[in-house]
Amino acid sequence: MKPLKFLFAALAVIIVTDTARAEDGTWPRTVKHAAGELTIEKKPLRIVSTTPSLTGILLAIEAPVIATAATTPSILTDDKGFFSQWAEVADERGVKTLYSNLNFDIEAVIGAEPDLLIASATGADSVLQHYAELTAQGVPTLVVDYSNQSWQEIAIELGKALGLEKEAAASIARFDAYAAEAAKTIKPPAGPVSIVAYDIGSTYSVGRPESPQGQLLQALGLKVAGLPEELRPQITRRSDFEFISRENLPAAVQTESVFLLRGTEKDVAAFLADPVLANRAAVKNRQVYPLGPSSFRIDYYSGRQMIDAVAQALKAP
């Protein structure tokens, strides 16, 4: 696998090349997206997002977001339902709540008078079922599938559509530089580490090395181990993480260091106190670390928070 810092650099080269082709600012431009094709008549100035999962990327590439849907407030959000990793930036830029609790509101969308709406094809914040309604109302809608793309790839896609190619490239470069600087302060464990999603909705899973979280740890100089080969027949569901039963968790945690997805210090304490894990080396040596609440999905802002969490946990003497 390519080290992530080199992947970032490659993406930046791609986007700079595309910028050279599109930087003349030619409008309209036609873009393909997850629901078809859209002709954008001029550079968007009033963007609304119905997908909080993408709002952070839009903010990172300096898109003119005027409003975003909000999810249900939780430990992952502020009191409005904006994800905590980008909520402050959104507030500073005057981003309003389009609607709350992911309850789609076509009247709120129309009332915002967007010149472009960003929607997702998958996930709890998808409004794909309302795509026909949106287009019938004359709302230019761009649908993005974030289920199988990194935030950098999505930034490139959005940058091309919005005429923000340079801004997308700059966001990737900033992130790459931030990771590189943090890596200088880290003393990586000698052996590989595991990423564990521990008791999230009563489920247990182990991160794959090629997951966004795994790639980011590797960019910081760590080696990431996936699920042991002998447990593969026990996998109940697979995505970026491979799900197993709680009974199989001890056999899954064979590394001497563990990072907890979406983990806080409270989660670390629960992991260390779990009797089924008492004999694991990571538990015995208390080398279990939180990746922070926002690490469940990596974008520009949550990725930086995860970098900070790892740097804090593994700070070189």
Name what the model sees in each region.
Residues T55-N103:
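A short, structured surface patch at a secondary-structure boundary
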Residues I106, I110-A119, V139, L249, ...:
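Proline-aspartate-enriched helix->loop->beta-strand connector
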Residues P73-D78, D125-Q129, D145-E157, P192-A219, ...:
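Extracytoplasmic ligand-binding site segments that recognize negatively charged/polar headgroups
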Residues M1-F8:
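Bacterial N-terminal signal peptides that target proteins for export
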Residues R46-I61, A168-P228:
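Basic- and aromatic-lined ligand-binding clefts that recognize polyanionic substrates
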Residues I154, K160, N248-P317:
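Structured C-terminal subdomain patch of bacterial secreted/periplasmic proteins
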Residues V16-A22:
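Sec/Tat signal peptide C-region and signal peptidase I cleavage site
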Residues E37, S126-S202, F296, Y300-P317:
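Extracytoplasmic substrate-binding proteins
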